[in-house]
Amino acid sequence: MSLFRLDLKVINQTEQRTRFSMTLSNHSSRTLEEWTLYFSITRFLDASSNTQGELSQLGSFCTLQSLATLQAGAQFATEFEMPTPPLQLQCDGILEAFIVASEQYSVDVTPLQLIEPKSNPQPIAKVHKASVGIIPKPQEIHIDSGVFEFAHNEAIFVGCDQAKQAALWLIEAKPELGLSLGKEANKIEFKRLESLPHQSYQLEVTSNSITLFANDYQGFSHGVASLLQLLGNGTKATCVQISDSPVYDYRGMMLDCSRHFHQLDQIKLIIDQLARYKYNHFHWHLTDDEGWRIEIKAFPELTDIGAWRGKDLPLTAQFKHIDSKYGGFYSQEQIKEVIAYAKCRGISVIPEIDIPGHCRAAIKALPHLLLDRDDKSIYRSVQHYTDNVLSPALEGTYEFLDRVLEEVAELFPAPYVHIGADEVPEGVWTDSEKCQAVMTEYGYSDAKELQGHLLRYVENKLSSLGKRMLGWEEAQYGDKVSQQTVIYSWQSEEAAIKCARKGFDVVLQPGQYTYLDMAQEFDATESGFYWANITPLKHAYHYRPLSEIEASDPIQQKVWGIQAGLWCELIDSAERLQYMVHPRLQAIAEVAWTKETNKDWNDFLSRLQLDLEGLEGRGIHYRNPF
């Protein structure tokens, strides 16, 4: 317990403004003569409304300098406002704090005191636990009597090259079975069936044998995923006959590793879970304002400087761990390791290099290339930065993009690179002589066209490297990129439909249903955001993609699939990550895989009970909805 405590209390709120009192208590025997309070909060503070001391904010990192002495046993109090609607969750408050005087002191932060804390949890139906708990639900499954019991040292006969990596995954996932690859037909056989469609599989488990049929490596991986769920934490598989295939070809999850850095073992654990629930794409968000996480050999500064943040570092402390140097990055060798690990489980790894906004880490690392020192434009990003956008008018920007994209394209075998392109703030580039000159040269009338100008260059560069460009829905702003760009819609499904009508292929990732950083319940103590929605498990499960679009509408063919996403401003530990992921990841898996006519909420809950036992047996944290 610290000798200093910080309390934040809502004292007044309207539809668009909230006023707070903040109290710092000194429970020590020390008197602080000259001191500064540092704290982090994800909301934007109106510094001009502060009543005591001098308040400033950069991103989530706030500095309060006081001229008043803080006596031992005394308190310091101030008030300030946020231009925000009424707050609903305690995590809207201060995340962490510390004081610097003659030395640095830790500060205990109490939960935000809300005016009217709300608690309105959605009840979960009481259902019996299923005997077979496969998620997502197969299109056809017949459960027979009896079980197949694995004897130690069983061999798997692999009848085709496409099945080998799935067999190796099974061996690795269940080491207690002592499995190995066999050279001749036996009790466990993986066979190719060329008549099966892409990603499909058939699994037959009898008391004497296990036979898995598929036509490609992803189909075999999906079949192994079902077999692993049949086994659970044991050595027996219920006898079943399964014929299965996905509704959507693309089923992905995006993980933000910039806001907080996730260790390599956690990346692999996420990939394991994706494979078990038959996802086939891992979208790796590797760069953002708060950290550059991928080694680029052409620019070692990106990780020497851009991967680390702290109070006195070029990249300012943000969110959690603000009292010390924090960060990390993945070497190219580690990334190759992740790619191979994912491939063995039927998953393709898609890198994201977020441009032209969300680039503060890159700009701070490479100011000699990326900083336009004569740009007087005034803007503020959604995350409260005023210096996080690349300039389309600097030669250094294109040198940076060329070298980074060349290394990324060589490193990742997937045919796609995601370039972000979201949340470029209003006002950017408007007071830059260099940018205005580019607009004049090309006949642009709106500064927003400069985003399209830059992204068209990136699209052409990626095409020359054999890659197709992916981007958030803002990638088509400025009307410069071609319809070869694939759009990921995050603000709403309607945005995806509009892009598809324009001729773009799209991936559905509406924050209202698929964002795993949204709070999971109507309870003030829950962690998460809610700008898109409070997203309980039931709400995620009942997402019906394109439900208002006729099945015969050509737009249906423009939709590749569905993706879940986890932004990590509030997620700084393995336990919190897993808590936010499970069990909504399972619900979204069923949305993406299973036909709507085969889905049933109570049946899902019945299977989920068995699935959660499997998570617990593997030591994986989750939020228990029951």
Predicted segments, located by residue:
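Conserved, mostly hydrophobic/aromatic
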Residues: 22, 73, 156, 216, ...
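Asparagine-centered strand-capping/turn motif at beta-strand->loop junctions
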Residues: 12, 23-29
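Intrinsically disordered, low-complexity Pro/Gly/Ser/Thr-rich segments with frequent PxxP/GP/PP motifs
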Residues: 50-87, 462
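Flexible, acidic glycine-rich loops studded with aromatic residues
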Residues: 468-485, 489-626
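Acidic, contiguous N-terminal accessory segments
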Residues: 71-79, 86-242, 246, 469-476, ...
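Short acidic, flexible loop segments centered on an aromatic residue
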Residues: 29-58
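Feature activates predominantly on carbohydrate-active enzymes
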Residues: 196-388, 392-398, 407-416, 457, ...
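Active-site neighborhood of glycoside hydrolase catalytic domains
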Residues: 362-368, 379-485, 490-498
